[in-house]
Every structure is written in C-alpha cells, then in structure tokens.
Amino acid sequence: ASVSWARRCVYETGMVGSMLSLALSDGEATNRVADLAMQTNIWNVVFLVILGPIFEEWMFRKQLIDHTRKYGEKTAILLSGLAFGLFHMNLFQFFYAFLLGVMFGYIYMRTSKLRYSTAMHMIINFNGGVLAPWILTRVDLDQLDKVSQAAENGNVAAMEQWASQNATGLAIMLVYFLLYGAVILVGFVLLIRNFRKAEFYTAPEELPRGVRAKTVYGNVGMVTFIVLTVLLTAIGLFL
C-alpha cells in the first residue's frame, strides 16, 4: 500500500516539479539526476539503489527524527520531509522528494525501524534509476524522432518499419506502463481509504502551536541550510 502511494507521489509531484523547472528556466532546465540515471552502470546502481537510500534514511529519518520527535511528531516528520526535499537541490525532484520524505518519516515514526523506509526508498530508486531506463533502452527512441517526422510528411511505411523493429521493446514498455498505472491507481484508492487512520501522539516536550515554525525553521542552522540549498537549486536550473 505504501509503495503504491509512493509511486503516485513520484509521478504526480514529479510532473509539477518538471513543469515548474521548465517554466522558471524558460525551457532550458534539464533533470541532471534523470540524465545520470540513464547512464546505467554498476556504480550508478550501487550508489542510487543501495548506498544512497541507506545514507539518506539514516540521516533524514534516524538522525533528524530521533533528535526532534520529542518536540512533536508532526513537527519532526515535516522537518524530515522538507530537509530531504531540499537536500536533493533539484526542483525536478523537490516536490515528490518532500512528500516521500513525509511518508517515510511517518513510517519510521510509527515503527522506529529504519529497514522499512529504506527498503521502500531502494524500490523507488531501483524503479526510477534502473528499471525504467533499462526499459527505455529496449526502444530506439533516437530513430523514433526521425520516423515521426517522416510520418508527418506522409511516409507511414517508415513508422511501420520502426514499430516492427521495436515490437518487443514496445510490448515491454506497454506492460510496464500498464502495471505502473495500476500501482498508482491502487495507491490512490488505499490513500483515500486509510488517510484518516494516521495516528499522532503528543510528545513530552511538544512545542506550542504558535512557536513551532519559528523554533524549528527560524534558527541559524536551519536558515543557513534552507538558503544554501535553495540557492544551489536555483543555480542548477541554468547549468
């Protein structure tokens, strides 16, 4: 259920981040992480699927939440999600990284077990960084641009030939997108059904409502972190 909802977050908020990035950069921004993921090699797999999730979950869930949960569970979870999203320093990823960070934070808060959020993190990174790029390589996308132009000029045979040559890859891609869509749909249904079942408990040193934001986000360390990551994110839009 959680993985289904997570994939829905990745898809929908990723679209928001992409549109906003392109709008702010006048169409010049590129998703550097996606470009890197397309370069499938063993080291990318090791860092993206194994080491990255382990480090990030240890840092943003274990360390951050363990040190702030005494001030309020919701406060700690939102802080974990925001820090996780900003840490990526990539507007393409910020929105879905934030929501995933919140979800992973809630899972860790309720279980106090890092292995659950880490496993989900690995699955999501494997899908986006290994499985999806591999599926895309099964289809000759470079040639597709050419045959599409030829088809627009009336050369339908070129498109038919390309489809015939890439039939296996297209079939794999179709199955993948159908399964992906089904997972997103299931995740949405489960989210609606279980949203109100979320539980939060009063912490021993719960911050009063009126001072939470100032205390958590207004300190020197957090302000510095936010300013630096936002600045680097903005610079990255134009590089």
Predicted regions and their residues:
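Structural motif
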Residues: 1-2, 37, 109
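Single conserved hydrophobic/aromatic residue that forms the stacking wall/gate
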Residues: 1-11
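Helix-to-loop transition at the C-terminal end of transmembrane segments
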Residues: 12-24, 196-199
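His/Asp/Glu-rich metal-coordinating catalytic cores
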Residues: 17-52, 92
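Transmembrane helix-loop-helix hairpins at the membrane interface
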Residues: 43-238
